[in-house]
Amino acid sequence: MHDANIKRYCADSVQLWTGGSRGLLTRESASRVKVITENHISSQRQGYICSDNIHVLHDNPFDVAKRHIGSGKTAVVHFLDPKDISGGCMAGRASRQAVMCARSNMYPCMDSANVREGFVTYSKYQFHSYDSDRLVYIPAVTVYRDAMLNVMQEKDWFSVDMIAAPVPYMPGGQSSEAYFNAKVLMAVYKSRFKNIFEAALSESVNNIVFDDMGCDENMCPPALIAIALREAIKEGGYAGMFWQIICAVDEPYSQCMTGKMSIAGRFEDAFFRTETSREYIRRMESMPYTPPKETLEIIDGPILGDASRIERFVRWRAGNRYFGKQFSILGDGISTLAGFNPPGYEVYYTGDNCNKCGVYHMKDTWWGRLIDYYGGHLLVNNSWKGSMVTYDRCGSRKDYSAGCSKERTIHLHVGSVEPDVIIIYMGINDWKQGAYAERPMYDRVSEGLAEELIFDSAANIMVDRISRRYPRAEIWKCGLIGTYVRSDPSFRLSKNKNGINWCKYNGGYYRAGHFANVAFNEPIPGYYSIDGIHPNVEGMQKFAKMVVHGFDYLFEPERFAKYIDEKYDIVEDLDYDQYCKVLNEDVQNRYEQTKPYSYLT
């Protein structure tokens, strides 16, 4: 819906429902608002004999609720962005949440310290974009406008309870590049639906009305949400605990992007079919796949114009042991990308840095190429710009940003979905800041330092915490490598300000547990960078290639030759401060000048 008056309508609602006698009604409702935590279990288990009480309607949830008010306590379930409970209505954004705020006093009822602290602020500190299962129960929300936003006669106003649930945004979804992981979304929605039903039971709700559940603005596949809801109802036995369970998932502006079928039509079709969540996930994984150029660039040899070899790669990919597996990343700024990292984390690849490096999409990054190469799925990218494996001795960074911290090592999963592979690439900032690579002998300064301040000890703590929390996951530890820039490849960066070579830090990784160590055994290891550390798009390609070579689980291994870069005469190693002074700022990004490939014949 696009309405230039949405801001005025919402402002009118706030003014109408915060003053006078109507303000008393709002404050009374707000005083009874509850924040319901995750994994809520109701002590009430009401039972009804209902043979046909689940419906999918092409209608507005408020209007559906109005028709059922006389037949028991009714609640409308609304999925919203917990970081903006107004839905942008005060800024004039025409979202579903904004429309509901314009039609009722829902926003003034939710605008309380209890909700801001226990729901809004809490959501800002989640470690992934799917958010939590926390809910807000809002009693007696008054609806006074109709679906066309016209003020109804006061005798037609009505009150209905509401349950606000966080919409699970897909990674990259808020930066226009949504990444779809069917297994994760299915698990997240099922868990959220169960918490909603338990909350409704605790409040003695008889009729429960769902809105679009996030498949409108979030554009999550309606079929997936329908299957998740159906299985949640079946597993919890909720069909016999409510008089009516209604899905009102269609409004005039809730249309499929293709225009072929409404969201409600696709939802209804999937809801009343027999396809299970496992069958749906398998069907998604078996969809036709065309490898992007960025993935094919990992493979040695002339493959971009070789259709038969591309076909062989697609078959190998579908049968390799990592196909369909869940990958999590633990890294620093090199592994960040706008929209793909936890809320509140500092990100390097965003805005102007993306323009400088030519890294805009997941398929441009080293980890995106690698995951697609093996046919896996991104689970969590827990990467933070500037973070180190160790605690910061200087105190300029909080301890919880360190790779060895408990906060980062236990947040590599989403709900019930655990990682199959965890890839660690960190340490460049430890090297840059001059952290102790190992505890030196006869050094009084280092004698009293905590283990978390010494790199090899911190790396061991990090890997140990990860392996204890995720005992079934493979852990791939990537060693540090040098870098160079295309404008002057003779400059090599390998020593920090204390004169310590980055190779010293790799020793700490290799001693940290018996897990897969990805060693870069290249003749001239390194990648193209924009500033001596952060790779540009060509550097991302080389980096992904080196990880695959280092892990040595390859497509057509007999045809893989070690990636031999051009030979350069290496000048004396420079420390980071010297390097920054002599760095040629006129770095040309060859990616922007290269014509698109036509790799399929």
Where are these regions (language model features)?
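Macrodomain-like recognition of ADP-ribose-binding/processing modules
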Residues: 1-208, 212-295
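Catalytic His-Asp segment of secreted/periplasmic serine-dependent ester chemistry enzymes
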Residues: 480-601
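Conserved SGNH/GDSL esterase-like catalytic core that processes O-acyl groups on lipids
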Residues: 337-440, 444, 448, 486, ...
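A short helix->loop->beta-strand "cap" motif at the edges of active sites that frequently abuts
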Residues: 242-243, 376, 470-475
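N-terminal secretory targeting modules
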Residues: 279, 287-362, 372-373, 417, ...
